[in-house]
Amino acid sequence: MIKSELVQKIAEANPHLYQRDVENIVNAILEQVASALERGDRVELRGFGAFSVKKRDARVGRNPRTGKQVDVSEKTVPYFKTGKEMRERLNTGK
C-alpha cells in the first residue's frame, strides 16, 4: 500500500472528511514521525510498533562490480520494531 491508497481508504471509511483533509492529516503524522527520528527520538505507537534510529559504524565494504574495497562511512538509519499486538496479528493461524 502506498500513501495515496492509505489516504483513499481512510477517506472512504470517514465520509464526513474531505480527502484533502485526510491527506493533510496523514502528511502531518508522517512529518512528525520523521522530525522526531531526525532529532534522535523514539516514536512508539502502542499495538503497532516503535520507530527509532540506529547508528551504523564505519566499515570496509566491497564494490560488487570490481571487488575493490571501499570505505563506508558511519551513518544513522531508521529502525522499526513491531509491537506485540502486531506480531500476534501477523502470526495468527500460521
Curated annotation (Swiss-Prot):
Keywords for this protein: DNA recombination, DNA-binding, Transcription, Transcription regulation, Translation regulation
CDD domains cross-referenced by the UniProt entry: IHF_B (cd13836)
PROSITE patterns (alphabetical): HISTONE_LIKE
GO biological process: one example: regulation of DNA-templated transcription
GO annotations of cellular component type: chromosome; cytosol
Gene3D superfamilies, per the entry: IHF-like DNA-binding proteins
Family annotation (Pfam families): Bac_DNA_binding
One annotated GO molecular function: DNA binding
PANTHER family listed in its UniProt record: DNA-BINDING PROTEIN HU, INTEGRATION HOST FACTOR SUBUNIT BETA
Subunit text: Heterodimer of an alpha and a beta chain.
Function: This protein is one of the two subunits of integration host factor, a specific DNA-binding protein that functions in genetic recombination as well as in transcriptional and translational control.
Family to which the UniProt record says this protein belongs: Belongs to the bacterial histone-like protein family.
The name this protein goes by in its record: Integration host factor subunit beta
Organism: Xanthobacter autotrophicus (strain ATCC BAA-1158 / Py2)
